[in-house]
Amino acid sequence: MKLWEADGHKVIAHLTNGHVVVGMADCYTSEQDEPDGVASIIIGDGLFFENQIESIELA
């Protein structure tokens, strides 16, 4: 699943550090709009960058 497709859905994200985050995905920001050039999304109350997410799926 692409990161932008998760926006507005409850998701399960497997992070590169081994943690798993479950929550509503919101506020997708493309790499073009991020200062560091890496897309991001809010899941629950945390902000995650695309390079921190190993995989993401609908919950």
List where the protein language model places each region.
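Conserved RNA-binding domains used in RNP assembly and mRNA/RNA metabolism
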Residues: M1-A59
